[in-house]
């Protein structure tokens, strides 16, 4: 399981505005495809796009960690109900992944493969 954020390292405002995918985004997909090729193991890729409330920094590098670890209340930000739901969803995905090797039993997060380079978006 690996991912990147919308305003991650080396991303310009123009890239975000145009929807251009970054080298990190593309690298996650390439890494996933290579893992499948070499070891036959599925990989799950995510793209975090939620703009955190409280400033205009957007979905900066590591912004997803508050959600992923369920630590929203340890931060000064004025979280909204949507943030709490997103954090709960992400915690469920990560916990299920640790238990089973896949983030869900359902079809809402597919493995990223050469045939289907699926990327789960969190917004």
What are these regions (language model features)?
Residues 2-123:
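C-terminal helix-and-tail extensions that cap enzymatic domains
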């Amino acid at each position: 399981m690996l991912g990147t954020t919308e305003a991650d390292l080396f991303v310009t405002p123009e890239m975000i505005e145009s929807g251009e995918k970054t080298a990190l985004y593309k690298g996650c997909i390439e890494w996933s495809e290579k893992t499948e090729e070499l070891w036959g193991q599925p990989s799950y890729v995510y793209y975090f796009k939620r703009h955190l409330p409280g400033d205009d920094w957007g979905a900066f590098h590591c912004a997803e960690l508050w959600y992923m670890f369920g630590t929203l209340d340890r931060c000064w930000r004025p979280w909204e109900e949507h943030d709490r739901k997103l954090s709960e969803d992400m915690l469920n995905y990560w916990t299920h992944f640790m238990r089973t090797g896949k983030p869900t039993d359902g079809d809402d997060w597919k493995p990223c493969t050469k045939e289907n380079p699926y990327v789960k978006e969190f917004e």
